[in-house]
Regions:
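Patatin-like phospholipase
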Residues: 1-21, 29-254
Length: 254
């Protein structure tokens, strides 16, 4: 995600709004706070697993997940300059899943940190988050690449970033591996039929980088940059096509 944003900045292509699910909501919220990919990169490269995950055995035995998610929420509060989504510099929405009813929930008002925590609450890993009267888990359960949400919020041209890894995994050794691999399969199936709605789809090569892998940040950043560079001709063409369509519509009205 960060590498893609960096290239958009370098190419002077403005980001009019950000809609994110799971880690996309985390990256998106930090960027929406100050529109600075270098600050975003610095934050990401300092980030370690212990900054986000408050694992407790008691949670796993008696709760609804291995981690409560309080560390993740505190991390967002410390890194995002604004408390509420309405205050962010870039219009922003996080996507979560209503665990009771299996419905997509768009969080575009209220606490930034709570919205990101809910959107990133991987089932079984993080406890569900009670927010705005709903019990919420990771948005990827129902919509891992929220193109429809961006369209509904008025996006004219949607650039979607798909960081899903290939589902093959022969190194499953424990219950956490089972949860993560099951989630990965679910996300992959979900993404497969949703991503076709994007004007431009960017697919960084992050195969082999797991959901909880914090050791390959530089590789992921470079993969995002390369994928965005590869997609740039398609993005430029899409921008010109939108401009031509608008010009034609205006001429027709005249």
């Amino acid at each position: 995600h960060i590498g893609v944003i960096r290239v958009l900045e370098q190419e002077r292509i403005p980001v009019a709004q950000v809609v994110g699910t799971s880690v996309g909501s985390l990256i998106g919220a930090i960027y929406a706070s100050d529109r600075d990919s270098f600050d975003l990169e610095w934050t990401a490269f300092q980030l370690e697993q212990d900054d986000l995950f408050d694992f407790r055995i008691a949670n796993a035995v008696m709760g609804m997940g291995y981690a409560k998610g309080e560390k993740l929420e505190a991390f967002v509060k410390a890194r995002v300059k604004h408390e509420n989504i309405e205050q962010l510099q870039v219009p922003f929405a996080a996507v979560a899943t209503d665990l009771n009813w299996g419905e997509r929930v768009v969080l575009d008002k209220g606490s930034v940190a709570k919205a990101v925590r809910a959107s990133s609450a991987i089932p079984g890993i993080f406890e569900p988050v009670l927010h705005q009267g709903k019990l919420l888990v990771d948005g990827g359960v129902v919509d891992n690449i929220p193109i429809e949400v961006a369209r509904a919020r008025g996006a004219d041209l949607v650039v979607a970033v798909d960081i899903g890894e290939k589902v093959g995994n022969t190194n499953i050794k424990g219950v956490v591996d089972v949860i993560l691999q099951s989630t990965n399969i679910m996300f992959a199936v979900n993404t497969g039929f949703r991503r076709q709605g994007a004007d431009v789809l960017v697919t960084p090569n992050v195969d082999g980088v797991g959901m909880l892998d914090f050791t390959q940040k530089k590789r992921c950043m470079q993969a995002g940059i390369q994928a965005a560079r590869d997609a740039m001709p398609r993005l430029r063409a899409a921008i010109e096509a939108k401009k031509a369509k608008k010009a034609k519509e205006l001429a027709g009205r005249g």
